[in-house]
A protein has these predicted regions:
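Noncatalytic scaffold domains of N-terminal-nucleophile
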Residues: 19-49, 61-179
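Classical eukaryotic N-terminal signal peptides for Sec-dependent ER targeting/secretion
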Residues: 1-8
């Protein structure tokens, strides 16, 4: 019994090491950053800097997001490629309205499941020929990223498109540091 208590005591001594008493480890680079004035965050510092410049020039969050989206096509294509698609949610605080833009890739108007996958039902296609839906010409779509970013800017941006894209174009022309 005494031995069990010693083992249990040693275990409980280790708990602070396993579960620190603070939620945030300020020595770690991975912790929340909080701001009252706004911030721009992306997977690339140079793209984020462009977004910050847009905000400082009087642009809104959508202007900054559009600039960062196009910039990432140059700085980090896997994160911001113009050959893909996506979704964007935009919240307008003044009206408490939420808007969504769906700019996933689309198939041509004349395409249909029968032409693409034969007479199988969608369930059969997913069960029998799942790879066809991902790795064949039938899976190809027209990219929607450019449309989506431009649509967001047109509907919700405050700066001109020229003002939003100037730093992005400059970045693409002048090149980036590759590490």
């Amino acid at each position: 019994m005494q031995f069990s208590r010693i083992i249990l005591f040693i275990f409980f001594l280790q708990i602070p090491e396993i579960y620190p008493d603070k939620y945030l480890d300020y020595k770690s680079p991975f912790h929340p950053t909080i701001s009252d004035t706004g911030m721009v965050v992306s997977q690339n510092l140079e793209s984020s800097k462009i977004g910050s410049q847009i905000l400082q020039a009087g642009g809104n969050a959508v202007d900054a997001a559009v600039a960062v989206g196009f910039s990432l096509a140059t700085t980090l294509p896997r994160a911001g490629n113009v050959g893909g698609g996506g979704f964007m949610l935009i919240y307008i605080k003044e009206n408490q309205e939420l808007f969504s833009i769906d700019y996933r890739g689309t198939s041509s108007l004349n395409s249909n499941l029968k032409d693409l996958f034969g007479s199988k039902s969608p369930a059969q296609i997913l069960e029998d020929d799942y790879d066809l839906t991902k790795y064949s010409y039938s899976a190809s779509t027209v990219p929607g990223t450019v449309y989506g970013l431009l649509e967001a800017h047109e509907k919700f941006g405050e700066l001109s498109l020229k003002e939003v894209l100037e730093p992005v174009i400059s970045q693409a022309k002048n090149g980036i540091i590759v590490t």
